[in-house]
């Protein structure tokens, strides 16, 4: 073959190779863009920092989870994580019967009868309830992972006092709504057995199914027994003060991806509605009054850090940092370059307006930038959707999936006292 034809043939082969590489490059770029549209904010090409819990093949994601949502512990944010995971994987979420509103007839002991029939049998449970082991195990499938979350009792009590000040009689009796006055002489205002009294004394113990009137000062054995009962059921007790580290342990426990535990902070009070810092003497008094809660928290805070040490503290902290960075990217994409929590009155999107417990407390939320639409916007909406709206949405969706007509619900036999109903924003 003449040299000119050989050079022409080589040039043709090189052109074909370039075209093939160009096609492959475009395909890869298209795939990455598609992943971005699905709100994937973690670089999948890099392994997570922490090694597996043990030398074993990769596990499938765990799909059955019961989360005991305790009060004023960042539980609404955890609930939102679980709701979104359930939606993405077409799982059934246990939701309260309308007679119970958006909680499982709290403060009554939980009963499987409180669950709406359109949401049974469930994969996920995450709404407020008072723990009852037998009833939950009757409802949830075998193999369900049970988790809960605790918060430092002094900070939690300040939040309870602020949030439920208009509903709890013990708090309403206090002159000038003074937390300091209440903690100076709690017995002067507190009445055991009164409606919503559990918000004023050892609320964590009550939520966990314990007797909130017991005191470890009088009966050490009771606290030890309650701790043992919690440890027998719950695979993980998260700690609100170390929320990101808790989510790292949660995703490892459930074999989830980091994307599965990204979040927006929900149900947060405005700075004007909370103490910037609790004085040491006040914190000590709060822990003394809520001694059962303090004992629970101190024990499970210690076991939490043992779990972190077992997983490798450095890698857990590194993964928590990666989680925070991915979360910031997600919030900027969803809510703007400088996402800020804002008062309900400033939120235009009705589905994102958080309910207000009273005129004295401002609960903040997010808003979507105007002019956006599509799957990514829908995902951002769910990320910041308050508990009441998301619960109602999921109930309607699961009714349609089950072929149930959207009609008024019958009232439960022996309905409970009406739970706290928050005022709509602006009311």
Swiss-Prot record:
Location within or outside the cell: Golgi apparatus, Golgi stack membrane
Q: Which GO terms fall under biological process for this protein?
A: glycolipid biosynthetic process
All disulfide bonds of the chain are: none
On whether DNA-binding is a keyword of this UniProt record, the answer is no
Topology, Lumenal side: 41-427
Q: Is Magnesium among the key words of this record?
A: yes
Residues linked to a glycan: 90, 109, 176, 301
**Top-level lineage group:** Eukaryota
Q: Where are the transmembrane segments?
A: 20-40
List the SUPFAM superfamilies hit by this protein, alphabetically. P-loop containing nucleoside triphosphate hydrolases
Record membrane topology: Single-pass type II membrane protein
UniProt topological domain (Cytoplasmic) ranges: 1-19
InterPro entries recorded for this chain?
Gal-3-0_sulfotransfrase, P-loop_NTPase
Write down the required cofactor(s): Mg(2+)
Task performed by this protein: Transfers a sulfate to position 3 of non-reducing beta-galactosyl residues in N-glycans and core2-branched O-glycans. Has high activity towards Gal-beta-1,4-GlcNAc, Gal-beta-1,4(Fuc-alpha-1,3)GlcNAc and lower activity towards Gal-beta-1,3(Fuc-alpha-1,4)GlcNAc.
* Protein name per its UniProtKB record: Galactose-3-O-sulfotransferase 3
